[in-house]
């Protein structure tokens, strides 16, 4: 395979079937735009050039790519062949191998791309390599007519003979060619068809007419699944999630009800992790070995240390870091919370913008009050502190090591190491008051009924 590789990614379609203000190829799969799934696979090849052909909503694509690829604009949009031609300027002087990919076909593995490039560099020097597949239902696809692994003809379903329609090998649209061959062939493509468009597939028939060979590489249908509608987007998400679940279990995680666990593209799981039903991982989650995540948790942007227990019904928000063997229980929410080894918040607690030392315990109903309507403030809690139930810690504040905050306290000033802080109104005891109150109210109610 040549060391000089370029990738042209076609993303100029309007995506009208998505019915969205967001560009079609930026709709997320596993919390990542589908285009970036494809670009990650492309990057595994270390290409010298990456060109994304854009049309509608080009500003969205430019922002999403963040300068990692050159943009070429197709305006007007006159077919796939015309789209590829728009990348010629960006590839001026490039004399290596070119992959032609589609932004709405996001799951093409790098290994498949390598196979196409390897075939392009074979001794028989094909002019074009076509990526083909055999779908369950070939009705909507153009056919690839072959002799061995040579492509002798490409034909759309509507134009195919009965014999050609019986062929199950279909065109994915993805191709590879030498840069000089690609643009020379494209220059000869015409719009002599009903749609008055320049079709990329015509370069195969032109090359064959010149006596040049064209080759085929076959792949799995799932690798070239296209996404043009919300239903196809949902199917792609399901496909990706099924793959990730299998990968997680093969890597040593136990999923009690795999079909109910949802991962993001970058979720990392250690060994001997147990995940109960209905757990959702947003982006940026790292889970160490031996963690138990109980049912109905939502976790994003969090790092969970070895041996931790999370949930059920817990929410870990971005910036959460749990030390070894920490416990976050039911109806606990954390955000920008760094919790040391063995910290326990077992129920009904909010911990935001807080750093907590090892072995500190939070009683039910504890809240770090971190926002005054304008700014966020931080809470610092030392090791082995005990925060009693129904306590409000008003930031900015520091609670010292080994300190105790008594239940029901609203703490607004720092608590020293080893100190007890009790902020609670004196209990008022009035014997018989409740009996007299009930008696008076019953009499009043009876009088109103007369």
Language-model segments: residues:
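Conserved core of the sugar-phosphate nucleotidyltransferase
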Residues: 59, 67, 108-194, 201
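Glycine-rich hexapeptide-repeat left-handed beta-helix
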Residues: 309-450
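Short beta-strand segments
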Residues: 10-11, 53, 101-102, 130-134, ...
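Conserved alpha/beta core of the MobA/IspD/sugar-nucleotide pyrophosphorylase nucleotidyltransferase superfamily
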Residues: 3, 168-269
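Catalytic metal- and UDP-sugar-binding loop of GT-A-like glycosyltransferases, i.e.
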Residues: 29, 101, 421
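N-terminal nucleotide-binding beta1-loop-alpha1 segment
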Residues: 1-20
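Acidic, glycine-rich loop-and-beta core segments that form the ion-binding/anion-interacting portion
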Residues: 260-325
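Conserved N-terminal catalytic core of the sugar/cofactor nucleotidyltransferase
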Residues: 1-6, 32-118, 123, 442-443
């Amino acid at each position: 395979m040549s060391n000089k590789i370029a990738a042209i990614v076609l993303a100029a379609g309007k995506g009208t079937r998505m019915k969205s203000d967001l560009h079609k190829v930026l709709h997320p799969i596993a919390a990542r735009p589908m285009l970036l799934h494809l670009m990650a696979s492309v990057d595994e090849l270390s290409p010298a050039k990456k060109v994304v052909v854009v049309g509608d909503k080009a500003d969205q694509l430019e922002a999403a790519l963040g300068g990692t690829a050159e943009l070429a604009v197709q305006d007007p949009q006159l077919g796939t062949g015309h789209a590829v031609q728009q990348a010629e300027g960006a590839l001026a002087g490039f004399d290596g191998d070119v992959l032609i990919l589609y932004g709405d076909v996001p799951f093409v593995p790098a290994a498949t791309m390598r196979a196409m490039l390897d075939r392009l560099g074979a001794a028989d020097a094909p002019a074009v390599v076509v990526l083909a597949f055999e779908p369950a239902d070939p009705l909507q696809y153009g056919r690839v007519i072959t002799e061995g692994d040579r492509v002798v003809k490409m034909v759309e379903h509507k134009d195919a003979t009965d014999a050609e329609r019986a062929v199950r090998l279909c065109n994915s649209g993805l191709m590879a060619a030498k840069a000089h061959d690609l643009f020379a062939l494209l220059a000869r493509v015409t719009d002599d068809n009903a749609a008055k468009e320049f079709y990329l597939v015509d370069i195969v028939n032109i090359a064959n007419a010149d006596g040049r060979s064209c080759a085929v590489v076959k792949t799995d249908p799932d690798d070239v699944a296209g996404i043009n509608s919300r239903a196809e987007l949902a199917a792609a998400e399901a496909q990706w999630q099924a793959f990730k679940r299998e990968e997680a279990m093969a890597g040593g995680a136990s999923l009690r009800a795999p079909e109910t666990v949802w991962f993001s593209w970058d979720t990392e799981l250690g060994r001997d992790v147990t995940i109960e039903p209905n757990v959702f991982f947003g982006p940026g989650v790292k889970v160490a070995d031996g963690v138990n995540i109980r049912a109905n948790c939502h976790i994003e942007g969090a790092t969970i240390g070895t041996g931790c227990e999370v949930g059920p019904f817990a929410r870990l928000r971005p910036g959460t870091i749990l030390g070894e063997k920490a416990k976050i229980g039911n109806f606990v929410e954390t955000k920008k919370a760094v919790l040391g080894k063995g910290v326990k918040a077992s129920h009904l607690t909010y911990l935001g913008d807080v750093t907590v030392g090892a072995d500190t315990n939070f009683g039910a109903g504890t809240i770090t009050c971190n926002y005054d309507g304008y700014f966020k403030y931080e809470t610092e809690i030392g090791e082995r502190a005990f925060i009693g139930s129904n306590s409000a810690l008003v930031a900015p504040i520091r609670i010292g090591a080994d300190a105790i905050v008594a239940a029901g306290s609203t703490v607004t000033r720092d608590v020293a190491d080893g100190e007890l802080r009790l902020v609670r109104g004196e209990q008022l005891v009035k014997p018989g008051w409740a009996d007299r109150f009930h008696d008076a109210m019953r009499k009043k109610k009876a009088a109103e009924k007369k």
